[in-house]
Amino acid sequence: MTKGILGRKIGMTQVFAENGELIPVTVIAANPNVVLQKKTTETDGYNAIQLGFEDKREKLTNKPEQGHTAKASTTPKRFIREIRDADVDGLEVGQEVKVDVFATGEIVDVTGISKGKGFQGVIKRHGQSRGPMSHGSRYHRRPGSMGPVAPNRVFKGKKLAGRMGGDQVTIQNLEIVQVDTERNLLLVKGNVPGAKKSLVVVQGAVKVTQ
């Protein structure tokens, strides 16, 4: 069964392991989530729990939102996400999910929205090679061939310049270095997608390599 929690990316720092190794970590603030709904195979065709994170002013919510959260005896939430294949039987609607669902050393997947880079060329966006910069070359950072003459068109999927970033990205198999239950913090080894203060979803790894 998968387990998960919603949180906000705070930033990066570094901690020392017991053997003196310096470990770069990302700090994720995961205040208690509330189970808003349980979905089962019988009712919805799949198993999942719906989590709510961060309170939202009632003035900013509509009646369906208020009614949905009232069933869980809680206030309207700013972020609502589903954790698929979760332990539906072990959780009840209205129950809080805290950082202690994870333990130090566990392997997790972290999902977030990558930083937006704006309109970028093919070298930055797709990692293509540039042309010669001197010796009479007039080809430097352009996208290159658009394809053969015969179809007389550019095929769909051709890698060209365009807006970069702002996509949902999941980084898999990150290790939890520390769980701070007092301050509701998770310290995850390495970097996670997204800007500071952005929403991230931490879930148990689907492809554990240990």
UniProtKB/Swiss-Prot annotation:
Biological process according to GO: translation
Keyword rRNA-binding on entry: yes
Keywords from the UniProt entry: Ribonucleoprotein, Ribosomal protein, RNA-binding, rRNA-binding
Molecular-function annotations in GO: rRNA binding; structural constituent of ribosome
Superkingdom in the source lineage: Bacteria
Gene Ontology cellular-component annotations: cytosolic large ribosomal subunit
Positions of the UniProt region annotated as Disordered: 125-151
Described function: One of the primary rRNA binding proteins, it binds directly near the 3'-end of the 23S rRNA, where it nucleates assembly of the 50S subunit.
PANTHER family: 50S RIBOSOMAL PROTEIN L3, LARGE RIBOSOMAL SUBUNIT PROTEIN UL3C
Family: Belongs to the universal ribosomal protein uL3 family.
Subunit structure: Part of the 50S ribosomal subunit. Forms a cluster with proteins L14 and L19.
The protein, known as: Large ribosomal subunit protein uL3
Gene: rplC
